[in-house]
Amino acid sequence: RAHTGKNKVIRLQGHFHGWHDHMTSGFNSHHDGTPTRGVLPSVAESVILVPPNDIDCIHERMSSDSDIAALILEPTGSTFGMVPLVDGYLSALRELTERYGVLLIFDEVVTGFRVAKGGAQAHYGVMPDLTTLAKILAGGLPGAAVVGSREILAALDFDAMVAAGEEKIQHQGTFNAYPISAVAGSTALSIIEASDVNERANASGAFLRQGMNQVLHRMRIPWVAYGEFSVVHLFTNPDNRVIDPSSFDPLKIPWQELKRNSSHAVTKLRLAMLANGVEFNGFPGGTISGAHSEADLIFTIEAFEESLNMLQSENEI
């Protein structure tokens, strides 16, 4: 907003960007843009929510509203690809944002340095104006960064703003320039740069998804493990679709349905997985590390099968 002099932000329904006031509506509730509890209506009104993968809707919004400062999204799709984006979507966004003078922001808090050494933007070949980074950035310690063009980031530079006669953007923070996180992050990024950790983690993701789907097929459970890179998403099929894991295409499922997993079954599955020695994320699924060995992955697949057996024995699935 400071750079463009505009006020509004476009966001995609279902995409997560933290829980500050401008980002609470539209992730898992209030998809109509109304404010969540405690958020001022005037704040919610400055955010435009649009459905994912609808480039025409974004075009219409940008062409009819000259007060849009930025568009922010997760470049792999909501929740690290739980709701993937169609091919060419990011390139189309880049073209539209440049045409209408809107900044393009990638939220790579999860995907940065994970999808590829250069993050999702390097993998897809689309360069945003700003990118948010965290998690891997600080080597597992508290730490985050906003990166982007020198022209935009100059608003954070004391000397540049004094020279320009403009007010500097405030950005105080508890962990700003925190040396321990900086050392951990620098070390972690050096390891990533010099190794094949990305490729190994991505290959492990494919191995785990395949193994889980083999279990589901063998047990005749109409669920599917899917995803890309080093993540596995588990679709628990809330509407009881006929599913073939070998041909499952999440783009053919409404995004709301992909995110509407059975909370009861997922809770029971997570408890069963814990009982069998594996922490399973609640989205549901998980991310794979380059440190995970083949033995770890096989152990996870076996724990998954035993956990499903436990749920079946209790008539939970």
Regions found by a protein language model. Give the residues of each.
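Conserved N-terminal phosphate-binding loop of PLP-dependent enzymes in the Aspartate aminotransferase
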Residues: 1-317
